[in-house]
Every structure is written in C-alpha cells, then in structure tokens.
C-alpha cells in the first residue's frame, strides 16, 4: 500500500523534493529494485486479457517472468545496473494489514463469481485483478531469472523496500526503484518511481529526494515518520477523519503523535483502540534489514544457455526472443565498457509542482495578464499513485 496520499501531499507542500527524470538519466547508475512489488504488478498487467493471465502450454502463469525479463532487459540496455531485492517474512505488525488484504481478496472472489454468473465482463476483468496473489515459487522463479541475467539478487530478512533503503543509505546504490512511498519513510536518500514502467507508457521517472522532502515539509526525520503513520501505512491504523493535509497541519502544530492525542478532540477524531503507533514508528526507524556492510555488488554477462534451458525448455518461451534479449544486453555491455559516465549527460532536472487540491493563480504585474492566463493550471502529478496489495 505504501503511504496514503503522500505523493499528492509532497506535490503541494514540497515540490522541490520531486523531479522528473528521463529513463536514460540513470545510465551507469546502480538501483535497488523492490522486486516483490513489481512481480505483483506484472501478475496484474502483463499479458492479461479479461481474467485470463499469460500462461504456457502447461497452464503455468508466466506473466511475472515475461514482465521481469522485458523490463530488466530495458534497464540493462540503457546502462542501468539493477539490484533485485525480494521480500522475506512480513513483520509481525503487518499481520493486521495482511488479514485485511486476505478479507478483501475473499470478497473480490465472491463478487467475481457473481459477475461471471451475470456475464458482466467489465466487472470480471476488474475483480479478477483484485484476487491476484504472488506465490513463493513465483518469487523464486524471478530470482532465478535475475541471476541468469547476471544481476545481483537478494532475499531480505523482512520488507524488501527497507533493505533497498539500507543499500541506498550505505551508498551501494544510487536510488531505490519502487512504487511504494513507504521507502521514503525508511529514509532512502532517493526513490525512483516508474523506472519499471513499459516504454510504451512513456512515463518519465519520478524521483524523490529524502532530505529535500523533510526540509520542504519543515519536519524532522522523526516527525516525518509520524506524518506517514497519520497518513496511513501498512503497520497500523490511523485516526479516523484525519487525512494527509490535516496530518501535516497537526504534526507542524504539535510535533508528535503523542502531543496530537493530548490536544485533539478524540470524540471528533477517534484514534484506533490500543493504537500501536509507537511500534510502527520503531519499524520505520529500525527495520529488520540485511547486513549490507560486506556486500560486493557485481554484474555479469547473461547466461544465455541457462536462460534458454529455463525460459524456453521449462517455461515454453520463444527461443529466438530469449536469444535476442541476450544479444541486446551483450551489445549494451560492450558499449558501456568503452564509455565513461559524463555528468553533462544529465540535463537540468524538471522541477514539478501540482494543483492537487488547490487552484494556482498567476499573479499579474503592472495590471498585465488576462483572465485566460489567470485560470491556467500548472501540470500536476495526480496520476502517480502507490499501489501495493
């Protein structure tokens, strides 16, 4: 799920923390990828027609492998160096959120059955996406694929995004590639969204800077964590009736959740019973992560014959397509070997602002300006949403 409404909140209150980057701007950059989150997205989107997912002749789902193969190939061809990190066991505090997700899946499955019986194809397609779940076997298949492609791959002891953030803080990678904004709550120095989007989507990479985030909001690191808990996170519930804007206002006024609870009308804004916000805060401050101190990251040439054995012979992929991917990656590696990184390659970042929740009016000078100019909106980022189910 990430942090509810955080992107919109930053767009309005700390636009300098966000910038649009070209995909090619990440040439020679190391990026830790939240693999588990992206596998789920591939299971929903890649090769889906109605409620039918991409499968091989044996009926095995291959959407996760197809999606990861093509997105990984695109990154490697662009000179990006991905590091894949997979979820380990969920933290105990996430049990409530996981139970809610299970209930929602069961509700969706019941509604899906009714939609099938009614012949409502639009509802069938929508509801079938809500019933998707990623198995341990599918995660291990993607890890095997990454290793055959010559990419470092790790299973985190707990949440993948927390270990990704630890890698970024340690300087092992430049940024974390994920759609989940709670990676920023784990204090990852840079978070890159849309890095795994298909080329056809033509989405710029949306990069968030942690230090500029807390500076732009006027908060300390601890206050930012409390803000994220108030907005809504995976680890605990939040105060009913308090959305992101109100949460920011309250944190700025009172400084902490404890002080907020002392000050607000709890009948108007009832907090959850036995609210474990302190436990959630501790999870964000000191998450269980992999020891990254002794990690030596290296990228190798793809194991072409190993990929053919796995994808073609086991999973019925087309051999010419698999070999074509390997050829493109080899060509990119050869080109990268003869290049040095040029800082001039990066154009000036485009700082973006948003009109989410408010209308920006351009003030006129010396009486100049028209009504048309006064009513013109600046480009927002409301299309960017975190999604974790």
Curated annotation (Swiss-Prot):
Residues 338-346 are annotated as: Interaction with PCNA. Binds 2 magnesium ions per subunit. They probably participate in the reaction catalyzed by the enzyme. May bind an additional third magnesium ion after substrate binding. Residues 1-105 are annotated as: N-domain. Its EC number is 3.1.-.-. Keywords: DNA damage, DNA repair, DNA replication, Endonuclease, Exonuclease, Hydrolase, Magnesium, Metal-binding, Mitochondrion, Nuclease, Nucleus, Phosphoprotein. Residues 374-389 have a biased composition (Basic residues). One of its GO terms (biological process) is DNA replication, removal of RNA primer. Phosphorylated. Phosphorylation upon DNA damage induces relocalization to the nuclear plasma. SMART domains: 53EXOc, HhH2, XPGI, XPGN. GO terms for molecular function: 5'-3' exonuclease activity; 5'-flap endonuclease activity; DNA binding; magnesium ion binding. DNA binds at residues 71, 159, 232, 234. Residues 356-389 are annotated as: Disordered. Its cofactor is Mg(2+). Mg(2+) 1 binds at residues 34, 87, 159, 161. InterPro entries: 5-3_exonuclease, 5-3_exonuclease_C_sf, Flap_endonuc, HhH2, PIN-like_dom_sf, XPG-I_dom, XPG/Rad2, XPG_CS. Structure-specific nuclease with 5'-flap endonuclease and 5'-3' exonuclease activities involved in DNA replication and repair. During DNA replication, cleaves the 5'-overhanging flap structure that is generated by displacement synthesis when DNA polymerase encounters the 5'-end of a downstream Okazaki fragment. It enters the flap from the 5'-end and then tracks to cleave the flap base, leaving a nick for ligation. Also involved in the long patch base excision repair (LP-BER) pathway, by cleaving within the apurinic/apyrimidinic (AP) site-terminated flap. Interacts with PCNA. Three molecules of FEN1 bind to one PCNA trimer with each molecule binding to one PCNA monomer. PCNA stimulates the nuclease activity without altering cleavage specificity. This is Flap endonuclease 1.
């Amino acid at each position: 799920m990430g942090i509810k409404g955080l992107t919109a909140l930053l767009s309005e209150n700390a636009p300098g923390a966000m910038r649009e980057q070209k995909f090619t701007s990440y040439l020679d950059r190391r990026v830790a990828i939240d693999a588990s989150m992206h596998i789920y997205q591939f299971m929903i989107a890649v090769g889906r027609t109605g409620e039918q997912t991409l499968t091989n002749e044996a009926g095995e789902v291959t959407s996760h492998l197809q999606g990861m193969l093509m997105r990984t190939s695109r990154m490697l061809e662009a000179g990006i160096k991905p590091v894949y990190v997979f979820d380990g066991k969920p933290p105990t505090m996430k049990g409530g959120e996981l139970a809610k997700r299970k209930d929602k899946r069961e509700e969706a499955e019941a509604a899906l059955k009714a939609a099938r019986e009614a012949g409502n194809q639009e509802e069938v397609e929508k509801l079938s996406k809500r019933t998707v779940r990623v198995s341990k076997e599918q995660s291990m298949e993607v890890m095997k694929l990454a290793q055959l492609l010559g990419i470092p791959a790790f299973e985190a002891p707990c949440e993948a995004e927390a270990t990704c953030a630890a890698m970024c803080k340690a300087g092992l990678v430049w940024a974390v590639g994920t759609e989940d904004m709670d990676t920023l709550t784990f204090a990852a120095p840079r978070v890159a969204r849309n890095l795994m989007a298909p080329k056809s989507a033509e989405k710029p990479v949306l990069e968030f800077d942690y230090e500029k985030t807390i500076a732009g909001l006027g908060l300390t690191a601890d206050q930012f964590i409390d803000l994220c808990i108030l907005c809504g996170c995976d680890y605990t519930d939040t105060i009913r009736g308090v959305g992101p804007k109100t949460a920011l206002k309250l944190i700025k006024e009172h400084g902490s959740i404890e002080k907020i609870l002392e000050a607000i009308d709890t009948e108007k804004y009832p907090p959850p019973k036995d609210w474990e916000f302190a436990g959630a805060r501790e999870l964000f401050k000191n998450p269980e992560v992999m020891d990254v101190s002794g990690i030596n990251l290296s990228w190798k040439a793809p194991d072409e014959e190993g990929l053919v054995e796995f994808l073609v012979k086991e999973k019925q992929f087309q051999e010419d397509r698999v070999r074509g991917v390997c050829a493109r990656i080899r060509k990119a590696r050869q080109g990268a070997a003869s290049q040095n990184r040029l800082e001039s390659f990066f154009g000036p970042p485009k700082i973006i602002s948003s009109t989410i929740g408010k209308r920006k009016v351009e003030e006129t000078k010396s009486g100049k300006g028209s009504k048309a100019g006064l009513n013109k909106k600046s480009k927002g980022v409301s299309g960017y949403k975190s999604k974790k189910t």
